[in-house]
Design a protein with these regions (language model features):
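Bacterial Sec-dependent N-terminal signal peptides
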Residues: 1-21
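Feature marking well-ordered beta-strand scaffolds used for ligand recognition
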Residues: 18-353
């Protein structure tokens, strides 16, 4: 079956607490790219950039990494593409994070995959690959860069989480291997909120980890909570008091945690999209008082969490209209941090919105 892919940008204008459907601004299709054998997904993660006063959307596919100038959403255009070291129907995951004018790219499939570092400072005119090697890592599920400490955390690398110094952004240096399995992470000022699958949420302080042999300090372990499943991902609010935690299981709720005291973490509320008993959240990002979630089959879901005891769903956009809730389909990633307020959402089967 031919897969029709789309790239679109959604503009959200927040004017009330009533749930509203977001407005679609731009749509791009490419029917030439193949889908994965595993999940029939051609796209995976999305990311956003502001470079030289231009807004750029980054999209991962089975072919590689696509860059779009979306400064004027109605006239958006693809401006660059970097092929993956591993491509084709075996690709499911790619992941991205940027630091100091470079985009860091990983893939979780293929024995020929690499860490790619792409110079993005000349966008929207061009990009250039400055590093493409498996000397440090071959496969990685997720990466997160703590820009405050110039460290990159690579999750799911050889069964560990590896920590790299980015003091020289083009030449990462491995400084630590964390031997507990970590699926995803959020890190700021060396404090790492680690989503460890069946081992729940672990919080570690990596302040003293600068060379091989140094050890982090564990600050908390949170494993017993309502709807505890596969602890998949999470995001911290700006005040470092509220943490949104997502377990990747059909029918499991999103949790808001009080993390103001790491010796006494508590669940403030649990909630869901309200669409289907088998709905499943994937990734979330907190911006201000809003929690943006790529909610798999239910598309984009936005919650007002100004009262963390009573989150209110305010916006939605269904990127995957099918009512089949089996497997992994629909919205994969979300990026709400562009200066314009435009929101990027990637859908595994229908492209990027």
């Amino acid at each position: 079956k031919k897969i029709i892919l789309s790239l679109s940008i959604i503009l959200l204008t927040f004017i009330s607490n009533a749930q509203q459907t977001a407005t679609l601004l731009y749509h791009w299709q490419d029917s030439t790219l193949v889908a994965s054998t595993a999940h029939n997904n051609t796209y995976n993660e999305c990311w956003g950039l502001e470079i030289n006063s231009y807004e750029i959307a980054v999209i991962g596919s089975t072919a590689g990494t696509h860059f779009f100038d979306i400064t004027d959403p109605f006239n958006s255009t693809e401006v660059a593409f970097v092929a993956g070291a591993y491509t084709g129907t075996g690709v499911i995951h790619r992941d991205y994070h940027d630091f100091e004018g470079y985009l860091y790219v990983v893939c979780d499939e293929g024995n020929t995959s690499t860490l790619q570092i792409i110079d993005i400072t000349n966008l929207p005119d061009s990009v250039s690959t400055v590093y493409d090697s498996n000397a440090l890592l071959t496969r990685s599920h997720n990466i997160y860069i703590d820009t405050t400490s110039a460290k990159m955390y690579s999750c799911g690398t050889n069964g560990t989480m590896q920590v790299y110094s980015l003091e020289s952004p083009q030449n990462p240096i491995l400084i630590y291997s964390y031997n507990t399995g970590v699926h995803d992470a959020y890190i700021i000022n060396n404090i790492a909120y680690l989503n460890c699958g069946g081992n729940g949420l672990i919080i570690e302080d990596f302040t003293m980890v600068d060379t091989i042999g140094d050890q982090p300090t564990q600050l908390a372990s949170f494993t017993s909570y309502p709807d505890a499943g596969y602890n998949h991902s999470g995001w911290l609010n700006e005040n470092k008091t509220i943490y949104a935690m997502l377990d990747e299981n059909h029918g499991y709720d999103v949790k808001l945690l009080d993390v103001s005291d790491l010796t006494n973490i508590s669940v403030l509320s649990i909630f869901n999209s309200g669409v289907d008993p088998q709905s499943m959240a994937h990734n979330g990002i907190i911006k201000g008082d809003l929690l943006f979630i790529s909610y798999y089959h239910d598309g984009l879901r936005v919650f007002d969490i100004s009262d963390p005891l009573n989150p209110i769903q305010t916006w939605e956009y269904d990127t995957y209209p099918s009512n089949n809730y089996a497997g992994y389909k629909g919205a994969w990633g979300v990026y709400p941090n562009l200066p314009s307020g435009n929101i990027i959402v990637s859908d595994m089967q229908t492209g990027l919105y």
